[in-house]
Structure formats: C-alpha cells, structure tokens
Amino acid sequence: MYNDKKRLTMINKRLTASVVASLLCIHLVQAQTLPVYLDESKPMEARIEDALQRMTLEEKVAMTHAQSKFSSPGVERLGIPEVWMTDGPHGIRPEVLWDEWDQAGWTNDSCVAFPALTCLAATWNPDMALLYGKSIGEEARYRKKTVILGPGVNIYRTPLNGRNFEYMGEDPYLASRMVVPYIQGVQQNGVAACVKHYALNNHEVNRHTSNIIVDERALREIYLPAFKAAVQEGKAWTLMASYNLYQKQHVCHNQRLLNDILKGEWGFDGAVVSDWGGVHDTEEAIHNGMDMEFGSWTNGLSAGTSNAYDNYYLAHPYLKLIREGKVGTQELDDKVRRILRLIFRT
C-alpha cells in the first residue's frame, strides 16, 4: 500500500513537471513568434518601427487619407486596425452612412448630448472638465471610436461666429486651464482627443479663403495658449488643422504653424488631421506637417472618379510623386509613425 502511494506520488510529480515544462515551451514559442509591433509589453517606439518596416509603400500611403466619411484604413494583413473618428466636442454623433453626412438609421447609437463647451468653461471647474471628458470618452469607447473630434478651443473674437458655443470662451487662460483635464478625461478611456481648430479659425464666414493677419504677440498671447496647453500639458494624441490661411498658406499644410511651432517648438508627437476638405495641395501637404487627410466625397481631386478617396491629395497623387522619384519617403514614414502611435495608444 505504501509503495503504491509512493509510486502515485512520483507519477503525479512527473506529470506536473511535464505539464509545467510544456506550458513554458508554449509560452517561449509564443514569445518568440509574436511580432514586436503586436507585443504590448514592448516599448512603443520599438513597436512602431517594427510595424513600419513590415508595411508596403501602398499600405503606408493608404493610412494617410480617409477611406470613408469618418474612417481611415489600417493594415488588415498585419492586424493593424482602422482609425474611426466621430464628432464631437459635446456629444457622440449618430452613425452616418459610409460616404454621406446622412444618418445611417442605427437603433443602438443614442448617446448623451452634453452641455456645450461654453457652458463647461463657464463653470471654471477643472474637476468638472475632467469628469466631462471621461464621460464623453466612455461613450466614444462604447461606440468603438478611436478619436473624438474635440475639444474646440478657438477664442471668441466676434459674437457673429456661429461656432462660439462649442469653444471655451474668450479668455486664453481659462481655455488653457479647462482643456487640459478634458483631454485627460477622454484619453483615460483609450480614446484620442482631437483638439481643434488649429489655428486662427475664429469666424465661419469665408473660412476656406480667409487669410488671417495677426501680429506675433497676439498670436502667442491670445490664439495659441490653449492649443499649447493641450499639447504640452494635456498630451493630446491628435489635433485638427483649420480651414483658413495664415501667411497666405492654408493651415492644413502650413509650415509655420504645423512644422515650426506645433511639431518643432511644442514637440507634438501625435497626428495632425485635416478639417474635412481642408487640404488643397499635395506637395505642401507632404512637406508641411499634414498627416491624415479627411473630407467629403468630391473634395480635392476626386470629382467624377469611381473611388474618390483614392484621389485625395495624399492618396494616388502622393503615390505617383513617390514612384516618379519627385519626392522621397522620409515625410511619409514620419506621417505613418504618428498614425501608428495613435493606433497603439488607443
């Protein structure tokens, strides 16, 4: 009897050791076969570089422009997900059709309509801004969105601006203090805040063609502080460039605002998104800091084509310039790094 028990104990120990060894082997094999870009335990930048070197030229260019009204492609071959965006600063937009602004008629896309951001700013309560951002971020996550197109922090300069209600007031300091916790609250949910409309978009009349004239002191003391706080303190993951011009160059591909100030001085490492249809020139968009082009079906070079999105300025026209050797891929790789950083953060 004693020998039988001893024999069983020995068998159990051997079986346990065998199972443990097998599990360890499986774990080691999985660790060896899991690509770096899919391994969340690896450093973010290592994952980005690993994904980048696996992507084709066509896959990289595809990531820099929309595939629908509110989405851009990932890389299905590599398991890199799409990016899905939604309005807005004070409530998640009902689902729309793939190519249109019309509602899609879903029955499970109802969300809270929060008070507009001008009301939030009037509380002078950063804790409330944090709760507001956290709450709207939760709803965006429920709806499987990557990016919320907000908050807006353009400064009130005229009562005739039809979008004043969705901004945070006329005081640059107040807007700077309220936008930071809003962003932090949203991004706690793994959803990116997209701060808009950078910059100098302070009225809606002729907004696509207005060249804004402002001196350096006013630019730095009135119009930029809230955006700077959003980037450097709020750590916003995306930012939307505006429709207007500054120094006679569209802001969606403006060397001074996007490259020199935003990405240079402020160290912004996220992705710059165009306002819908705000891109007007392929080469400027390549070189001057635009990362993701969004728009409507007939924007830009797309009128009369079978697939409008392939004819956006950062789509086939961009690919054609690279293939012809007229531009390199350094700027493209920077754009894709920023988009991958957005995807891995969310």
How does the language model describe each region?
Residues M1-T33:
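Bacterial Sec-dependent N-terminal signal peptides
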Residues A31-T346:
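Glycoside hydrolase catalytic-domain context in secreted enzymes
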